[in-house]
């Protein structure tokens, strides 16, 4: 069983955003969602996280309609990091990570304190943020701040981790750092990762499965080497590109010019 989408249609202000999507997200794999700006990538991610429930069709988790699963139960299985997150003023890294334990608490019960501490500590260690626990989030660099947000998501102990352009605004080193953390979580914990990426080469290197969205529908889905090629770049993004193999034996796409109409 897995996270699946059947005939998904989303409209906003009577405008088609997604139309007739059918998708299966392989359990324990890394799926990258790519496509041009405005294609509906972030909308799809919000639907998968039940942040947007105004749609036609069915989104199911292990065969159960997502809209019938309680928000608390869903948050224990699925965590999402949208774009543009803003931390409360003066909050520390440790306190932010502790927010990830909210799905395990209720208004009349604080939860299992020992389990919460262990989950938060593990999340900080997994992201290399254990020595930053008492630092204010707003005082961190961009890369450190993104790792702090990932730690919060990991404290939920989810089976599914959804990320919307997790490397946006980061320099090359911090992009690599974040992508390696995500891949390690997938490899060591068999965590299912679904991420919207704008960097095609990140998708080539760090995804097991690619979903390409164009004109509000699925242009292609498959393994990176099957769907990421110069023909796709021309048709979906309108650019000509070269493809070569780098020193690590990985394929790299290098855009060189716009496609001439």
Question: Residue spans of the language-model regions?
Answer:
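Catalytic Walker B motif of ABC-type/P-loop ATPase nucleotide-binding domains
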Residues: 161-165
């Amino acid at each position: 069983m897995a996270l699946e989408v059947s005939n998904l249609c989303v409209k906003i202000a009577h405008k088609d955003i997604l139309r007739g999507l059918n998708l299966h997200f392989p359990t324990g794999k890394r799926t990258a969602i790519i496509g041009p700006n405005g294609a509906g990538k972030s909308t799809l991610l919000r639907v998968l996280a039940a942040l947007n429930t105004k749609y036609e069709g069915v989104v199911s988790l292990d065969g159960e309609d997502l809209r019938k699963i309680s928000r608390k139960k869903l948050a224990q299985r699925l965590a999402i990091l949208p774009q543009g997150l803003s931390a409360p003023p003066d909050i520390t890294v440790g306190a932010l990570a502790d927010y990830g334990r909210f799905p395990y608490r209720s208004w009349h019960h604080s939860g299992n304190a020992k389990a919460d501490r262990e989950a938060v500590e593990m999340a900080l260690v997994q992201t290399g943020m254990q020595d930053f626990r008492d630092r204010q989030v707003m005082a961190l660099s961009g890369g450190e701040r993104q790792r702090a947000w990932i730690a919060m998501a990991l404290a939920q102990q989810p089976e599914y981790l959804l990320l919307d352009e997790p490397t946006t605004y980061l320099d090359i080193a911090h992009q690599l750092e974040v992508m390696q953390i995500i891949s390690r979580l997938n490899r060591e914990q068999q965590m299912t990762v679904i991420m919207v990426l704008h960097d095609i080469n990140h998708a080539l290197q760090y995804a097991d499965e690619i979903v390409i969205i164009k004109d509000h529908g699925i242009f292609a889905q498959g393994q990176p080497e099957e769907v990421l090629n110069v023909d796709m770049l021309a048709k979906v993004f309108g650019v000509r590109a070269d493809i070569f193999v780098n020193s690590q034996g990985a394929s790299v796409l290098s855009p060189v010019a716009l496609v001439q109409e």
